[in-house]
Amino acid sequence: MDNYRDENRTKGNENEVFLTKENDQSASYSARNVIHDQEKKKRGFGWFRPLLGGVIGGSLALGIYTFTPLGDHDSQDTAKQSSSQQQTQSVTATSTSSESKKSSSSSSAFKSEDSSKISDMVEDLSPAIVGITNLQAQSNSSLFGSSSSDSSEDTESGSGSGVIFKKENGKAYIITNNHVVEGASSLKVSLYDGTEVTAKLVGSDSLTDLAVLQISDDHVTKVANFGDSSDLRTGETVIAIGDPLGKDLSRTVTQGIVSGVDRTVSMSTSAGETSINVIQTDAAINPGNSGGPLLNTDGKIVGINSMKISEDDVEGIGFAIPSNDVKPIAEELLSKGQIERPYIGVSMLDLEQVPQNYQEGTLGLFGSQLNKGVYIREVASGSPAEKAGLKAEDIIIGLKGKEIDTGSELRNILYKDAKIGDTVEVKILRNGKEMTKKIKLDQKEEKTS
């Protein structure tokens, strides 16, 4: 569905991401997909960033950090009180010293056993982790400023990570992020033994930020398996493996916990804005980790690392796409090379991006009708929307019985709750009057040249 146009597209491989959470305040953090780009300059992000084309992000209010200096609060009175308390604590410590030793010994043994298990798992699984280099054509200009495609050459634009999840019939297949491979004229994959091979892009999907690559299985000795991300619990140990900052630090292992499940992030992609479900983790995720696996302690893929909060005052907030969302996308990309989605055929803008005087004076909206819904800028000729009688400057306020406030909500309902061939009811406002239209959803025809 080609709803959002170029004004929503991001530069290079960097995307704007916002945390969304119900009933939070209007503060927002900017975040970025974690792909290493050698030519990318550091960019500053403020608390609020204006976005064009109706890119709407929710927010997460994190409050005010309060730091208490240490060692500056002692007085004579508190020193005496502390001394008195120390005597009590000393007695308590003495009476439980043997138990403490047992507890400490038991804890150390547990940590050693747990650490050994993780080390064994990482050692076993590392051959399935790969580095991915995105090569893009760069024209060589002559002294007179002219350029020729004949003199262009592929140069490294960025790099990321991936994981081999399937091997059959002499081929191996890698899952990674779409933003790792997007725009590439060719792709190189670095394997565990140092071998570098050319990869073929089987298919990619910008709205879920996933892609599948194919390589020869000549040097592939290990395949990782998907786990069940619905079994994840907050506080559970997870491990991230990838190539932060490129191949020099290949297969770097970081450990953390599941900080939260069923988070929602609203992300601007080259295909428009979308909201995706993610796992939050504090396992260190750095530029170049994109596309690498988030693993449980059994060595199963429970997520694909995709993005992180990137702010000076923020530490340890990274996100991974859950394995249960990754698997069906990977399977469809393998079988069809693309994700087939229902198509309406409108170019749209969140209504709140339209000036209120235009909403009132031109669109005929008033009161509670203002700033809620999706403004149709253009209806594609021959599209399902045109056949259903939708027109430019209509406002979509409902789909399949659910209220619509933003394009992201419309897209989520359309892609998750409907399928090609369905006939759905669309509620609209036209000149301030509410009406309902029935649209038979179709698949967008790919342009051919």
UniProtKB/Swiss-Prot annotation:
**Could you name the Gene Ontology cellular component terms for this entry?**
plasma membrane
Query: Which Gene3D superfamilies does the record cross-reference, listed alphabetically?
Result: 2.30.42.10, Trypsin-like serine proteases
Q: Where is the active site?
A: 179 (charge relay system), 209 (charge relay system), 290 (charge relay system)
User: How does the protein's chain sit in the membrane according to the entry?
Assistant: Single-pass membrane protein
Positions contributing to substrate binding? 288-290, 344-348
Extract one GO molecular function annotation from the record: serine-type endopeptidase activity
Q: Where are the residues of the annotated region Disordered?
A: 1-35, 73-116, 140-163
Q: What does this protein do?
A: Degrades abnormal exported proteins and responsible for the propeptide processing of a natural pro-protein and for the maturation of a native protein. It also plays a prominent role in stress (heat shock, ethanol, puromycin and NaCl) resistance during active exponential growth.
PROSITE patterns membership: PDZ
Q: Name one GO biological process term.
A: proteolysis
Which organism does this sequence originate in?
Answer: Bacillus subtilis (strain 168)
| Family according to the record | Belongs to the peptidase S1C family.
Q: Where is the composition biased (Basic and acidic residues)?
A: 1-24
Reactions catalysed according to its record: Acts on substrates that are at least partially unfolded. The cleavage site P1 residue is normally between a pair of hydrophobic residues, such as Val-|-Val
Which cysteine residues pair off into disulfide bonds? Answer: none
Give induction info: Transcription is CssS dependent. Induced by heat shock during exponential growth and by heterologous amylases at the transition phase of the growth cycle. Negatively regulates its own expression during exponential growth and during heat shock.
PDZ domain span: 348-437
This chain belongs to which protein, by name? Serine protease Do-like HtrA
- Please state what class of enzyme this protein is: hydrolase
What ranges are annotated Cytoplasmic (topological domains)? 1-44
- For this protein, the Enzyme Commission number is 3.4.21.107
